A protein has these predicted regions:
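C-terminal motif of bacterial Sec signal peptides marking the signal peptidase cleavage site
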Residues: 2-4
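Intrinsic-disorder/low-complexity detector
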Residues: 6-175
Length: 175
């Protein structure tokens, strides 16, 4: 690379395959003004960019970026799409991307709830084995045990609800 923030290496600038660079940028969802970053990088080695070739490649790359499958995959990573897709498909892609972000959020919440359930179950098992009863009376132990049972039940229900919601999204989008 030319510098720590250069978008292209010296060799990429000298090769000058602007259509291929544009395709890569389009497939990554980069906007039209991204070419200015390449201009800056390549001007340091005395190379001018070719806007027409780059934009032609970018438009082809956008066909890969602006798909329902890709919109959902981006959302499943917890990310929003860059607003570079044609206006006629943008609302649908934004909805699908939002569903992907919901999947991401539900998955994170499921992981948290599963960790919580494990913790409750370990506490409950210790109580049953009387390994670490730090309560002063048997009634306190029973009350604590009942509270844990209720937390386990509630957490299990939340986990089941999250799993159902995730399964519904998986059915809708096929994965």
């Amino acid at each position: 690379m030319l510098s720590g923030c250069a978008t292209l290496s010296k060799q990429e600038c000298l090769t000058g395959n602007w259509q291929a660079v544009g395709f890569t940028d389009g497939a990554a969802g980069r906007p039209a003004d991204y070419l200015s970053s390449h201009n800056k990088a390549c001007s340091k080695v005395g190379v001018a960019t070719d806007y027409a070739a780059w934009e032609q490649g970018r438009q082809e790359g956008l066909k890969k970026y602006c798909t329902e499958t890709h919109a959902y995959q981006i959302g499943r990573r917890g990310e929003q799409m860059t607003p570079v897709c044609p206006a006629q498909v943008t609302p649908n892609l934004e909805r699908i991307n939002a569903d992907g972000r919901i999947f991401y959020s539900l998955s994170k919440q499921l992981s948290i709830e599963q960790e919580r359930l494990n913790s409750y179950q370990q506490q409950y098992d210790k109580l049953l084995k009387r390994h670490s009863v730090a309560l002063s009376s048997q009634s306190g132990v029973t009350e604590y045990q009942n509270g844990l049972s209720e937390r386990i039940k509630n957490t299990t229900q939340r986990i089941n609800n999250l799993k159902r919601a995730l399964q519904e999204l998986q059915r809708t989008y096929g994965y």
